[in-house]
Amino acid sequence: MDNSAIFEEFNSKKISQDDLEATITSLNNYFVKLNDLNNQYINLIRQDNIDKIEKQNIRQQQKQVKVEIKKISATTKLFKQNLKLAESLYKKIKLTNNQDDINKAKHEVEIAKSMLLQLKEVINGQGKSIKLKKLSDIAIEINHLSFKYGPEFPNAIDDVSFTINQGEYVTIIGHNGSGKSTISKILIGVLNAQHGEIKIFGNIVNDHNIEQARKFLGIVFQNPDNQFIGSTVEADIAFGLENKRIDPKKMPDIILDSAKKVGMEWALKKEPLNLSGGQKQRVAIASTLALDPDIMIFDEATSMLDPKGKREIKEIMVQLRETRTKTILSITHDMDEILNADKVIVLDHGKLVRVAKPLEIVEDKDFLRNIQLDVPFVGLVREELEKKGIKIASTQNIDELVEQICKK
């Protein structure tokens, strides 16, 4: 039986994929606009002299945008009707016993269901699927941040402010309890600060946009075992890409490229848990790199590794620094690592006590010892040589130190 007339009528009435994409694009554009207005409003109310007219204008614009979002959200009804239309088509075609046409009609039902679900996800997500714009070249800006774990506890973070520029490699150091890991948890949204603000590329992070802001971030934790989900290295890297809804056709190249960047392309078919500690951490870094975050946070990423593993991870971090395509924030106990950084942030009992170049920190051995931090190895060697009357110029690594000694 020829069902072409039935399909022709259906095609003239159905909602297309282009219609869905146009609806979602329009909706996301309004969510982006609302986020920008929220940023403007927050910045305005924090000023000493608030312009009441400007405040009223922003509030009015926020209301107008919310009305538009509500209007577009109401189109869900049309997509529900579209699903009913496809289901009606399927019922009609099923009666004809033409299997090819039945499969074709069934596929139309699946498409209509998928489109309705996609639209609902965007609406229910309230803009969580949008990508925030970069409003500034400052990757991370923390202003007067304070946090305590409970009313009876002292501040774990006490009025801390600092900035990290796009492409910088910055380390945060401090003894146990200094607050460095707390800052990491606040940045990724695990904890909420009681006071102060965080900006990611100029976007003020708040309850409404935390999910979008986190898309700028990739994090490598202390214990890579906790990050493994897949049965192979390849599957583990793929897991994050699937969650990000990357085109499956593009995934093999992305997986291979990220594995090559950390020297683990040979292990793609291996089980992650059977690898060495350093290799596991390299896989964790590859999984993060595959998602292409603008900011990479290394939270004590070398603390559980043997010396060989530590060296391998630090070499990867230096390679990333040299590309200047990623902003690197490393929270670390490893005092030798700070020599690779552009800038060092020092915390003590929740307070920011110093921001300086690595060599400035290494040179001030009394300062480090007063806040219970180890002096990096090159600093200790220089100190011992100076005691014996041998003056050595400041060096940032062991190779430079050996070269200086050989010249004596």
From Swiss-Prot:
Keywords: ATP-binding, Cell membrane, Membrane, Nucleotide-binding, Translocase, Transport. GO terms for molecular function: ATP binding; ATP hydrolysis activity; ATPase-coupled transmembrane transporter activity. The keyword Disulfide bond does not apply. ATP binds at G174, H175, N176, G177, S178, G179, K180, S181. Residues 140-374 form the ABC transporter domain. CDD domains: ABC_cobalt_CbiO_domain1. Its EC number is 7.-.-.-. InterPro entries: AAA+_ATPase, ABC_transporter-like_ATP-bd, ABC_transporter-like_CS, ABC_transpr_CbiO/EcfA_su, ECF_ABC_transporter_ATP-bd, EcfA_1, P-loop_NTPase. It is found in: Cell membrane. Disulfide bonds: none annotated. Pfam families: ABC_tran. It is a peripheral membrane protein. Its main location: membrane. It comes from the Bacteria. GO terms for cellular component: ATP-binding cassette (ABC) transporter complex. NCBIfam families: ECF_ATPase_1 (TIGR04520), PRK13648.1 (NF010167). Belongs to the ABC transporter superfamily. Energy-coupling factor EcfA family. ATP-binding (A) component of a common energy-coupling factor (ECF) ABC-transporter complex. Unlike classic ABC transporters this ECF transporter provides the energy necessary to transport a number of different substrates. Forms a stable energy-coupling factor (ECF) transporter complex composed of 2 membrane-embedded substrate-binding proteins (S component), 2 ATP-binding proteins (A component) and 2 transmembrane proteins (T component). This is Energy-coupling factor transporter ATP-binding protein EcfA1. The lineage of its organism: Bacteria, Bacillati, Mycoplasmatota, Mollicutes, Mycoplasmataceae. The gene is ecfA1.
